Each structure stands twice: as C-alpha cells, then as structure tokens.
Amino acid sequence: MATLQDIGVSAGINILSAFVFFIIFAVLRLQPFNDRVYFSKWYLKGLRSSPARGGAFAQRFVNLDFRSYMKFLNWMPEALKMPEPELIDHAGLDSVVYLRIYWLGLKIFTPIAVLAWAVLVPVNWTNNTLEMAKQLRNVTSSDIDKLSVSNIPEYSMRFWTHIVMAYAFTIWTCYVLMKEYETIANMRLQFVASEARRPDQFTVLVRNVPPDADESVSELVEHFFLVNHPDHYLTHQVVCNANKLADLVKKKKKLQNWLDYYQLKYARNNSQRIMVKLGFLGLWGQKVDAIEHYIAEIDKISKEISKEREEVVNDPKAIMPAAFVSFKTRWAAAVCAQTQQTRNPTQWLTEWAPEPRDVFWSNLAIPYVSLTVRRLIMHVAFFFLTFFFIVPIAFVQSLATIEGIVKAAPFLKFIVDDKFMKSVIQGFLPGIALKLFLAFLPSILMIMSKFEGFTSISSLERRAAFRYYIFNLVNVFLASVIAGAAFEQLNSFLNQSANQIPKTIGVAIPMKATFFITYIMVDGWAGVAGEILMLKPLIMFHLKNAFLVKTDKDREEAMDPGSIGFNTGEPRIQLYFLLGLVYAPVTPMLLPFILVFFALAYIVYRHQIINVYNQEYESAAAFWPDVHGRVIAALVISQLLLMGLLGTKHAALAAPFLIALPVLTIGFHHFCKGRYEPAFIRYPLQEAMMKDTLETAREPNLNLKGYLQNAYVHPVFKGDEDDYDIDDKLGKFEDEAIIVPTKRQSRRNTPAPSIISGDDSPSLPFSGKLV
C-alpha cells in the first residue's frame, strides 16, 4: 500500500514532469517553424501568416528574441482572456460547453473540499481504530488512511457527521447541476436561434424506405413526400453504397503522395533516377523506376475508380433504401423529423440529418434491418472485453500493494528493501501501468461503435464515450477497489472466517484512495500537461513538410490540429467526478488532487481550443444530457457505497437515514430530464418559424434549392481531378424527367399522372440526386 512518502515521491515526479512539459512547450511554441502546429486553428481560419517568411534566414526557423523566453508561462493567462461569447464564435458551442464540464467540476468540488477538510478530516483523524486493527487483525493501512472513515470505530456516533455531510454534498451537487443544465439549455437555444444557415436545418434523414417493385428508391421518396408534405418538400438525394469507391479514392491519394515525394526528391537531385523495390516495405523484390511505377499505378487505379463510379450510378443494388430529404423551411423539416410518417412505425423512419461534415458516410450503406443484430453483437463483445480486462487491472493492483503481498509471499521482500524504489513502484508505477493498459481502449471502442452503424461522427463519439464510461466504472473503479482490497488484506483474508470477509472489504474500500491519488497525478497532472506538447502532430507535420509538401495547400493538409476528442476526454472527466463524489465523505484527502486536475485541464484545453483544435462537427452541445446523467449516476453510486460502508461499520442507527438520498437524487434527475432535456432532443416549432420568418424578410430571393442541391452528395463525387460530374449521369432527372410518373396499376393521391391510367395531376418538378 502506498504511504505518505510514496505519494510524495509520486507527486514530485509528476509535478516535475508537468513542469518540464510546460517548459518544452514554451520553447517549441515560440519557434517559427512550429507555428503551424501550435496555432493551427488560426491558420485554418486564415487569420495568421507564417512568421518564417520574413526576416533573416536564422529568424525564419529560430526565435532569437530572448525576452520572449522570460515569459514562458504567459500562455496560461492568455488562454483565460477570451470571453465566452467570443469563444463560441471562434470555436463553436460544443467546444465551449466541453470546457464547462471542467468548470462544473471546480464549482462542485471546491466547496465540498473545503467543507470536508474542515469537518470530516478532524472527525476521522481523532481516532485510533486502524492502529488497533493493525495490531489485532493484521490489517494493512497507512497514515493517509487515518484521514478516512476507516479510522472511526464501529457503532460510533461520529458516523452522523458523515451522513449530514453526504446530504450537504448531494444538495450542493444537485443545485450546481440544475443551474448548469438550465444555463446550457439556454445557451443551446440561443445558439441555434442565432446560428447561420446550414443544410442540416432544412434536411432530414429518411431510412428504411420500403421496397417497391414498380419504382426506384428515388421515385418512391419523391412521390411519398410530394403526397404527404406537398407544400413543403423541396428536394432529396438518395444514399448510395460508395464504400468500395471511397477505398479506391483513398488508395489513389496515398499513391499520389508517394509520387509527389519521389518527384520532389528527383527535382532536388536529378543526377540519377530513383529506384524502389516492390517487395514488402521495399526491402526486397524487383527494382523499378519509382516515378514511372507510381504514375502507372495511379493511371491504373484511376481507371478502376471511373469504372466503379459507373457501377455505383447505374447499378440499382448500389442504391440504399435511405435518402436526405430537404424542405423549403426549417419548420417543415422540424415537423417531419419529429413525427411518425406512416402507420407502420418501422418504415419511413425520419430523424434530423447530421450536418454534412458530421456524416459518417460508410455507415449509411449498412441496411437498417441489420442494425439491431449488429448492436446486440457489440453488447456481447463489450461485456467480454470488460470482463477479461479485469486480469490486467488485478495485475496493476498487485503493483500498488507490494507491502501487503510480502506478508503472504516473503520471497518478494527484496523489492521493498530500497525505500526510494519502493516509493517509485507503489506511488508512480501503478498509475503508469493502468494508463498504458487503457491506451488502445478508445480505438477499440470507436471501432465497435462504427460496427453498430451510427450515421454521424458525433453519435459515434457519444456511444464510444458511454462505453468508455461504463468500462471505467467497472474496471478502473470497481475492479480496482475489489482487487486492491483482496491484495491488501490477503493475509487477513486467509486467516479469518468467511463471514468476516465483507467487513474487511468494507474497511479496505477507503484505503484504495492512495492508488487513485497516484493515478490522478499520472493521468490528470502529467498526462494533461503532456497533451499540450502535441508530440505526434508535431513530428508528423515536420515529416510531411520535409518529404511531401510542395505547395501552401499541401502544408495546410500536413497540419493535424485534432479535436477535443469527446469519446476519450469526457469519460476521463466522469471518472474524476465519480472518484470525487465517492471519496468526498470517505477519504477527503483525494479532493485536492482532483481540484488540481480540473483547474489544470481547464487552462490547457482552453488554450488548445483557442489555438489548435479544429472541431469536426457542431452538435450545439447535444451531449450535455449524457454529461448530466453520468454525474447523477456517480452521485447515486457514492451514496450506495457510503450506505454499504456504514453498514459494515455497524452504524445501524445512522445508515438508514441514507436510504432517502438515492431516491431523492433519482427524482431530481427525472425533474431535470423533463424540464431541460427537450431542448436537446427536439427543435421547438415556434423557434423554427421565427427563424424562417426572419430569413424570408432578410433574403426574400434566396435560392434555397441551389444552396441545398449538393450539400449531401457523397464526398467521393466531389472535388476529384478526374473529369467526371455525377450530374452528367443524373441530369436527366433535372432536365428530362420534370414529372416522375408512377408505374403502378392503382395509386391514389399521386401528384403525377400514372403511365397506365393516364389520370391528370399537376406537374411537379423532380429534383432527386444520388449521394
């Protein structure tokens, strides 16, 4: 078990690491050749030019102004200067609300920490229960545990203090959550009301279009919406399966990068042609001329791309039973997106379309009927992933409990002979080991989310974040506590009756605070400080700049600003909320470490959002109900654990008074859900009508159809250098097929005449396009 000395060694290592990271960052950010890495957002907005273009040759690469190095931490106050309204305009509402999660942590835990240290620490410290348990029952403990509830004897009246504090912590947390929910809801409504025109405001995604033997998907979609939304339907774009085409385009881009590299290399030294080997990684195989080889490969794959495009456009099997349908007004889109279209609730399913940059195109090709099966498979896979990950978690706990294991395994005693090494192993290594084990988890969870078939990047990230949160709850928290308790009290477990084991675990739960303190310092202190260095984007930018960049456009594409990473960042924040709320009434020693994390992370990520991150999408803070719900879950878990802990301490008179807390907390959650959540899942028709009215008054001659015409065209049909225009293949729908007649024997309320019946109907234009 980590002692106070071990915690001190870990704190020293992590504080030193964070300080070194900040110094390195301060030096690197001042160098002109790194300007595009550490200020990439300003370059993407076109508001910053490279300082390396002017001045002396040396000044283009190295900052020779030594006065700038004297203020190496001035980026911290600068990150706090930009006011929130300006930050919303600069980075979007998603980024600002994400920052408010850190601010929420500070608002919740600062008063809680002050109250806990003022009231609970003296109550816990003035007892000798652990000393007596150590002598009588051979229970392992440290000086830090004397500040916890474990140090209070059974049947003590002092437990009433912890119950009163639990009520105080709950009331304060719920109050802050309610005020924040109200603020975020108002920010969202105001943001949506003042937001510039976007295609997704007028568009819905229609899925599970029923098959029809007589009509194509495009014709069927048009007929359905002309009949059921006759005054509001504007245009649509059917979805196609272009995944194979997208893979070919991606492969061609890689080949083009290699060709650019070898052409640039040959231009610098044209004394001899460049030769490459065709074998694995260029280590063996036939030698060929590099430039000629890649020109031939690009020509070959270009022909494949053209052929695949023809197949996608002309093959009915490539057309999916889904479409992006656009309307003349936001009001009409809101009505369609938020209502059931037919008596069969499994057909003609409508939802708000993601904004074009948020669409995850490859998943649109997944048949809707297979989504349930896919999600069931992923639920099972996630269960086994979570279950089997308990093994490395138990290994991490063994690193954190050397002293306890030595009691049962004396041959390991040589490990703890050196006090400093023992402090490093127990105070630093467990946190590092756990962080390494979790390194690949976000990628695995994102792959699982993609397999489930979500159609937008934002929904993918929210699902991955939810699974990461559950994983942290089960493995990082619960498994660490249970496995750690078993390791720490191993000798006690082996020499006591079975009915005494729950009591030993109850005493041991607060003792795991030492492990979580070390993890917070590794992940929340040094880890957050290391984020600002951006080592991977920095290295990749300079490699691309050296070998691939030929133009300013190439240099812009070489930048990798990244984003806030909701799927990884938010679950980590929620783990700290969970730890803080669980240990606030149990071991207040942990709270200052959490406060340092929230304060440091708020400053670092505010700087990154202002200067670096380029958000991939804008959901107008649609994720906030998830954030609120997980904090509530952490609060309920903390109450249940405290109730169980007091039960093991035989606080029979005091413990029942905690039963009301989870009930009241869940009731509070339902109140907030009913009061504020509708602003995040539905678009008020009143707001939509107001925005439409204002836009009509300001732009009476707006060509909305032209604005929406190509908004949801698949990216593989856009901006390619090949002389290919999808409208050339589908222009007949615009020019020749002004009216799309039905081909059925009988059809009521058809806005176009039937080919067979010849009934008259008003002419209505068709504007369907292929996505």
Swiss-Prot record:
Keywords: Calcium, Ion channel, Ion transport, Membrane, Transmembrane, Transmembrane helix, Transport. This is Hyperosmolality-gated Ca2+ permeable channel 1.2. It comes from the Eukaryota. Changing residue 335 to W: Abolished homodimerization, leading to formation of a monomer. Acts as an osmosensitive calcium-permeable cation channel. Specifically conducts cations including Ca(2+), K(+) and Na(+) in vitro. Inactivation or closure of the channel is calcium-dependent. Mechanosensitive ion channel that converts mechanical stimuli into a flow of ions: activated in response to membrane stretch and poke. Residues 741-771 are annotated as: Disordered. GO terms for biological process: monoatomic cation transport. One of its GO terms (cellular component) is plasma membrane. Changing residue 439 to K: Converts the channel into an osmolarity-sensing phospholipid scramblase. Homodimer. Residues 1-4, 126-156, 402-419, 486-504, 589, 649-651 are extracellular. It comes from Arabidopsis thaliana (Mouse-ear cress). InterPro entries: Csc1-like, CSC1/OSCA1-like_7TM, CSC1/OSCA1-like_cyt, Csc1/OSCA1-like_N. It is a multi-pass membrane protein.
